UniProtKB/Swiss-Prot annotation:
Transmembrane segments: none annotated. The lineage of its organism: Eukaryota, Metazoa, Chordata, Craniata, Vertebrata. It is an enzyme of class 3 (hydrolase). The modification Phosphothreonine is found at residue 5. Residues 729-733 are annotated as: Essential for interaction with SMYD3, TSC1 and STIP1/HOP. Homodimer. Identified in NR3C1/GCR steroid receptor-chaperone complexes formed at least by NR3C1, HSP90AA1 and a variety of proteins containing TPR repeats such as FKBP4, FKBP5, PPID, PPP5C or STIP1. Forms a complex containing HSP90AA1, TSC1 and TSC2; TSC1 is required to recruit TCS2 to the complex. The closed form interacts (via the middle domain and TPR repeat-binding motif) with co-chaperone TSC1 (via C-terminus). Interacts with TOM34. Interacts with TERT; the interaction, together with PTGES3, is required for correct assembly and stabilization of the TERT holoenzyme complex. The TPR repeat-binding motif mediates interaction with TPR repeat-containing proteins like the co-chaperone STUB1. It comes from Bos taurus (Bovine). The modification S-nitrosocysteine is found at residue 599. Residues 285-621 are annotated as: Interaction with FNIP2 and TSC1. This is Heat shock protein HSP 90-alpha. The modification N6-acetyllysine is found at residues 58, 84, 444, 459, 490, 586. It catalyses: ATP + H2O = ADP + phosphate + H(+).
């Protein structure tokens, strides 16, 4: 390590020390860094290594056109040298170096454009680790250092030293210490409470975390001790040399001691010849260890990388204990140049859709320098499970979040990443077993993508898999469904609900299943959002079997029969609508029911019963939205069912038969439940059911345990039409 200054011994040189005041904004920034507590101070090392990497990039770039630029030092590297005795940490690079003008301008007198912006961001609660994005990463050194010395040598200038204790000014002088050849040496004089950054373990930890993929070797120099076995003679020679240094000892005092030891040794050798080999001494040496041996895997040719290497990199990147499920390694060249390595994990994290979670897990590098790992603009939220790295050659190193949002380069990168992810999923879909694992974990992401990404909706829809009325225990794609469609079938039919069994036994699918029409079962809440956007697939419209206006393939004879039924039951529909009033929008004859007497369908553009259930479960729901989006209910009756036929006869025989009202309400409430809705007044419905149970058990109205108002209601059920007391069921209302 060079001496800090020789000006004290040579007065002539002292005149060459120039003092400069920091530009106001920089002084303010340094004050903010020094006087505010930050927990993640370790980022200073990342910033200084990043600066070194930039300097090395610059000299490497210049040497491409002028190889003689490297005559002052062929090797491009970064060295880290901790010194516990002096309490200094030194970062040395063989980069381009700085001229005197560079030193004065870059480290103090000219504020970078990001200085003020970074201070404002800090005061608004931004993380100190963002400092590099504003181009002022060097000043993060003052997070841990009380004084910083920068010694630098540029090919076009002398060797200079810059120094500041952050007191509002800095000095620049010609450096007469050890010649550097070319490059920059940053010496951090650490604060008393920051000595952890001199520990070998801590430095390795930080470099691995932040800088392991820098494109130049980072070598750590550590002074260590080791035991060395020597003979007693050699040990004594060493001891003698140490004694000679002490002025208090006389040479004459040493001689008899040596003779005595020698004679002792001769006697001991006779007893034990190996004795003199057993003496150990402590020897100090400098250990050099390269910390970033793992070269950026994404810069290599994919054909040269084994699955094991991808696996090791994935685990080091994600700390996952399992191997990845799939990998996509590619580069884009032309007007824009970047490389990317993307992984699909085997399982979704438990907090995949939590609001506080990072929006993505892609690490952004610019020319092998890590920039950030939470760049929201890099990939859409529905792909937030993708892990990996993107390394751009075109983005500026000091890019800020604000710049990223406006960056056209980033928009192109994002578009390419999405495209490659979809390619990866499509490739994965060819392997049925692996795709099944993928879909179990990430189907929600695909469906969220269909809801959010209109541009890629078609490709994403090809990745969907569903159970259907014909698929058994296998999930099938929409393409598979289309290949099995009937000749005269125009639509893709689907039903949404909570479970596979629930939708399979639903009244809505009765006629479709009877006619051999396949129905897709959508049983995840997100399916409701997905089909709101996915209107069609391969020219076939997706139609919900729980909504009004269901069109089924039918011949002329079936159409004629249906019209006759509508005419026959027109009067009953009118009576039922009058009884139910505002509870339903209309009552119509159904073309979808076979074994159920009736069902509740919803209007084409309203919510389904399942969607209404989902929305009611939202803790922060908007009740005004609930009001106008809640399903507009239509009651459909089955003209072929005995209950409906008997009810029609009863209503036509006596328009004023009051039992009809109760029967209609009971049918409506039961249909609500079977169609997936909830009851507004479940207790009243329960009372009706209890009365039916009493009738079934033969419990008489006069039974003292029976409720007066509830016991008589059963007398008005259809089998008891002849009973005189026809008005009893009115009481329940």
């Amino acid at each position: 390590m060079p001496e800090e200054t020789q000006a004290q011994d040579q007065p002539m040189e002292e005149e060459e020390v120039e003092t400069f005041a920091f530009q106001a904004e920089i002084a303010q920034l340094m004050s903010l860094i020094i006087n505010t507590f930050y927990s993640n101070k370790e980022i200073f090392l990342r910033e200084l290594i990043s600066n070194s990497s930039d300097a090395l990039d610059k000299i490497r770039y210049e040497s491409l056109t002028d190889p003689s630029k490297l005559d002052s030092g062929k090797e491009l590297h970064i060295n880290l040298i901790p010194n516990k005795q002096d309490r200094t940490l030194t970062i040395v690079d063989t980069g381009i170096g700085m001229t005197k003008a560079d030193l004065i301008n870059n480290l103090g007198t000219i504020a970078k454009s990001g200085t003020k912006a970074f201070m404002e961001a800090l005061q608004a609660g931004a993380d100190i680790s963002m400092i590099g994005q504003f181009g002022v990463g060097f000043y993060s050194a003052y997070l841990v250092a009380e004084k910083v010395t920068v010694i630098t040598k540029h090919n076009d200038d002398e060797q200079y030293a810059w120094e500041s204790s952050a007191g509002g000014s800095f000095t620049v002088r010609t450096d007469t210490g050890e010649p550097m050849g070319r490059g920059t040496k940053v010496i951090l004089h650490l604060k008393e409470d920051q000595t952890e950054y001199l520990e070998e373990r801590r430095i390795k930890e930080i470099v691995k975390k932040h800088s392991q993929f820098i494109g130049y070797p980072i070598t750590l120099f550590v002074e260590k001790e080791r035991d060395k076995e020597v003979s007693d003679d050699e040990a004594e020679e060493k001891e003698d040399k140490e004694e000679e240094k002490e002025k208090e000892e006389k040479e004459s005092d040493d001689k008899p001691e040596i003779e005595d030891v020698g004679s002792d040794e001769e006697e001991e050798e006779k007893k034990d010849g190996d004795k003199k080999k057993k003496k150990k001494i402590k020897e100090k040496y400098i250990d050099q260890e390269e910390l970033n041996k793992t070269k950026p895997i994404w810069t290599r040719n994919p054909d040269d990388i084994t699955n094991e290497e991808y696996g090791e990199f994935y685990k080091s990147l994600t700390n996952d204990w399992e191997d990845h499920l799939a990998v996509k390694h590619f580069s884009v060249e032309g007007q824009l140049e970047f490389r990317a390595l993307l992984f699909v994990p085997r399982r979704a994290p438990f907090d995949l859709f939590e609001n506080r979670k990072k929006k993505n897990n892609i690490k952004l590098y610019v020319r092998r320098v890590f920039i950030m790992d939470n760049c929201e603009e890099l990939i859409p939220e529905y792909l937030n499970f993708i892990r990996g790295v993107v390394d751009s050659e075109d983005l500026p190193l000091n890019i800020s979040r604000e710049m990223l949002q406006q960056s056209k380069i980033l928009k192109v990168i994002r578009k390419n990443l999405v495209k490659k992810c979809l390619e990866l999923f499509t490739e994965l879909a060819e392997d049925k077993e692996n795709y099944k694992k993928f879909y179990e974990q990430f189907s929600k992401n695909i469906k969220l993508g269909i809801h959010e990404d209109s541009q890629n909706r078609k490709k994403l829809s090809e990745l969907l898999r569903y159970y259907t009325s014909a698929s058994g225990d296998e999930m099938v794609s929409l393409k598979d469904y289309c290949t099995r469609m009937k000749e005269n079938q125009k639509h893709i039919y689907y039903i949404t609900g909570e479970t596979k069994d629930q939708v399979a036994n639903s009244a809505f699918v009765e006629r479709l299943r009877k006619h051999g029409l396949e129905v897709i079962y959508m049983i995840e809440p997100i399916d409701e959002y997905c089909v709101q956007q996915l209107k069609e697939f391969e020219g076939k419209t997706l139609v919900s079997v729980t909504k009004e206006g269901l069109e089924l393939p039918e011949d002329e004879e079936e159409k004629k029969k249906q019209e006759e039924k509508k005419t026959k039951f027109e009067n009953l529909c009118k009576i039922m609508k009058d009884i139910l009033e505002k509870k339903v929008e209309k009552v119509v004859v159904s073309n979808r029911l076979v074994t159920s007497p009736c069902c509740i369908v919803t209007s084409t553009y309203g919510w389904t019963a399942n969607m209404e259930r989902i929305m009611k479960a939202q803790a922060l729901r908007d009740n005004s939205t609930m009001g106008y989006m809640a399903a507009k209910k239509h009651l459909e009756i089955n003209p072929d069912h005995s209950i409906i036929e008997t009810l029609r006869q009863k209503a036509e025989a006596d328009k004023n038969d009051k039992s009809v009202k109760d029967l209609v309400i009971l049918l409506y409430e039961t249909a609500l439940l079977s169609s997936g809705f909830s009851l507004e007044d479940p207790q009243t419905h329960a009372n009706r059911i209890y009365r039916m149970i009493k009738l079934g058990l033969g419990i008489d109205e006069d039974d003292p345990t029976a409720d007066d108002s509830s016991a008589a209601v059963t007398e008005e059920m259809p089998p008891l039409e002849g009973d005189d007391d026809t008005s009893r069921m009115e009481e329940v209302d």
